[in-house]
Swiss-Prot record:
Compositionally biased spans, kind Basic and acidic residues: 101-112, 193-202
Disulfide bond residue pairs: none
Name the UniProt record assigns to this protein: Surface protein F
Cellular component terms per the entry's GO annotation: extracellular region
Propeptide: 601-635
Residues with Pentaglycyl murein peptidoglycan amidated alanine modification: A600
Key words, A-Z: Cell wall, Peptidoglycan-anchor, Secreted, Signal
Membrane topology, from the record: Peptidoglycan-anchor
Motif (LPXTG sorting signal): 597-601
Primary localization class, coarse: secreted
Span list, region Disordered: 101-122, 192-228
């Protein structure tokens, strides 16, 4: 150290240089790797995280791809859209699209399998119903005796039972129907027993190689296919959800019930023994299914649908009989039942056609059932005629319908001409068909589709069309269901027709469930609503006070609300949401009369310019008023 003691500067220089060299060596060996790693990482981030605009564009494109997937349900599409809106990177978007495509492909394959199975079952059912129409036409003649009804039946047991029914007089209508239900149950039990026995026999190797070879050869690729389809599209009557049973084409129990109603209508069956004849027709179909050479799984599915149809008839009959048994005023009970299903105008017309004097409950129930069944035969002509019939301003409604194909001036002129000529509602419908024919549309179906396609509020338009035939609250529920099930405009109309043609008898069950729900709610709220007031507690000893006298005086006479007329039923020309209606404030309210925030946002987006002008004008006006007041105060 003595050597460097006199030269401290040289020592510091050497130490500094050594330190710098060591540091440079270390940095030279480490930094390139860090720089390379950082560069690679930056490249990955650049590829992964797109710019904000590019990401939004990719999300929009992905959402359009999701919309084009045909097999995905509406709820699944909304789920994937929500995930896309939350995606932060391109890889997340690609992964969501991949999952959606896989699910769509899977649903497509299962849908084809189920549709093929359902199509096969429906074709067999159509053939059976056609054969039944040819063979058992005698069953549907309302005035025939029970012995004549047996011409379509090939079972000895059914012959004996039905012959006994024919010997009953009108006073035993209810017993006849009960016996028919018992016979149908007994027949089903016998068929199922024979089916189980044949199944056990077919499992025997010695037998399966002989007589059953032909039947087994038919079944390999069809096992379970019918159950898969029917379990998906149909459910039993205890299922309160209609969404999985309402389809654009009648299937299963709906198809059977509709075919029987058509058959009874074509044969001009009277209301006498109506339910009994309906059950006899169903029994004939059950026997035909049992005697066919169909594969066992298809036969089982078809017989299950027959049993569902029987339960529907039984349930509807029980509800009607219960209502009639509650009161001695049969006309009032009948009116109550009709008004719970039909709209007021239809209920009044039907009530005039029903005879209650001197009739048993079963005979009244037969008349009501027949009219409910006729609701299933509603055609598009009937719907259009009812729309025009129930409108307050026919000319306006006709013009709105014509404007879906013609210009406003021409539509207004034609509408005025037709109303001034005094054409009947049916004649107006015929004229509408002629003018729609010029654009290639020739039927009432096409006209109603045009109405739905051009309606600004699809749900309200569907409700309006249904409400021309059924009670408005039921129409509202069905319209809500239809718009939730289907968004395809081409299929919405089919669902509307299916709701009337296949679910008319469900309306009574729906009303029963609504009544039960109302009772449950009343039971819950009763302790709150009916709790005693402060005055009741002060006056608990029952002494008459001045307040009691005042209350009695105020309660004398008619109620204050009695003088206020009922709210009129909305007219079709105002509720179909056709014609002009794109004003600044249109669409701000939902069906319940509350402000709809999504619709309000859409309205502001579409009309931002006039809204901006109005808001600006109001601001300028307020500033001017403020300054004017200041000047007045100074003066």
């Amino acid at each position: 150290m003595a050597k460097y003691r006199g030269k401290p500067f040289q020592l510091y220089v050497k130490l500094s240089c050594s330190t710098m060299m060591a540091t440079s060596i270390i940095l030279t060996n480490i930094l390139p790797y860090d720089a390379q790693a950082a560069s690679e990482k930056d490249t990955e981030i650049t590829k992964e995280i797109l710019s904000k605009q590019d990401l939004l564009d990719k999300v929009d494109k992905a959402i359009r791809q999701i919309e084009q997937l045909k097999q995905l349900s509406a709820s699944s599409k909304e789920h994937y859209k929500a995930q896309l809106n939350e995606a932060k990177t391109a890889s997340q978007i690609d992964e969501i699209i991949k999952r959606a495509n896989e699910l769509d492909s899977k649903d497509n394959k299962s849908s084809h399998t189920e549709m093929n199975g359902q199509s096969d079952i429906d074709s067999k059912l159509d053939q059976l119903l056609k054969d039944l129409n040819e063979v058992s036409s005698n069953v549907d003649r309302g005035q025939q005796s029970g012995e004549d009804d047996l011409n379509a039946m090939k079972n000895d047991m059914s012959q004996t039972a039905t012959t006994k029914h024919g010997e009953k007089d009108d006073k035993n209508d209810e017993a006849m129907v009960n016996k028919a239900l018992e016979d149908l149950d007994h027949l089903n039990q016998q068929i199922h027993k024979s089916k189980d026995a044949s199944k056990d026999t077919s499992e025997d190797p010695a037998v399966s190689t002989t007589d059953n070879n032909h039947e087994v050869a038919k079944t390999p690729n069809n096992d379970g296919s019918g159950h898969v389809v029917l379990n998906k599209f149909l459910s039993n009557e205890e299922n309160q959800s209609h969404s999985n049973r309402l389809t654009d084409k009648l299937q299963g129990s709906d198809k059977i019930n509709h075919a029987m109603i058509e058959k009874l209508a074509k044969s001009n069956a009277s209301t006498q023994h109506y339910t009994y004849h309906k059950l006899n027709t169903l029994q004939s179909l059950d026997q035909r299914i049992a005697n066919t050479q169909l594969p066992k799984n298809q036969k089982s599915d078809l017989m299950s649908e027959v049993n569902k149809t029987k339960e529907r008839i039984k349930s509807q009959r029980n509800i009607i009989l219960e209502e009639l048994a509650r009161t001695d005023d049969k006309k009032y009970a009948t009116q109550s039942i009709l008004e719970s299903i039909f709209n007021k105008d239809e209920a009044v017309k039907i009530l005039k056609d029903i005879r209650v004097d001197g009739k048993t409950d079963q005979q009244i129930a037969d008349q009501i059932t027949r009219h409910i069944d006729q609701l299933s035969l509603t055609t598009s002509d009937d719907l259009l005629t009812s729309l025009i019939d129930q409108s307050q301003d026919k000319s306006l409604l006709i013009s709105q319908i014509l404007q879906t194909k013609l210009g406003k001036a021409e539509a207004d002129k034609l509408a005025k001409d037709w109303t001034n000529k005094g054409l009947s509602n049916r004649q107006i419908v015929d004229q509408l068909k002629k003018h729609f024919a010029s654009t290639g549309d020739t039927s009432s179906d096409d006209i109603l589709k045009a109405i739905l396609n051009n309606a600004k509020d699809k749900k309200q338009a569907i409700e309006t069309i249904l409400a021309t035939r059924i009670e408005r609250q039921k129409a509202k529920l069905l319209a809500d269901l239809i718009t939730k099930i289907e968004t395809d405009q081409n299929k919405i109309f089919n669902l509307v027709k299916s709701a009337l043609n296949g679910k008319a008898d469900d309306l009574l069950n729906l009303q029963k469930r609504l009544n039960q729900t109302k009772k449950d709610i009343d039971y819950i709220l009763s302790p709150i609503v009916n709790r005693p007031s402060l005055l009741d507690r002060l006056n608990k000893n029952g002494k008459t006070t001045d307040l009691n006298k005042l209350a009695n005086l105020m309660n004398q006479g008619s109620d204050l609300l009695d003088s206020i007329p009922d709210i009129p039923t909305p007219k079709p020309e105002k509720t179909l949401t056709l014609g002009k209606g794109n004003g600044l404030l249109s669409g701000l309210l939902n069906a319940d009369g509350n402000v709809s925030l999504p619709k309000a946002g859409e309205t502001i987006k579409e009309h931002w310019l006039p809204i901006s002008v109005i808001v600006g004008a109001m601001g300028v006006l307020m500033i001017w008023l403020s300054r004017r007041n200041k000047l007045k105060n100074k003066a």
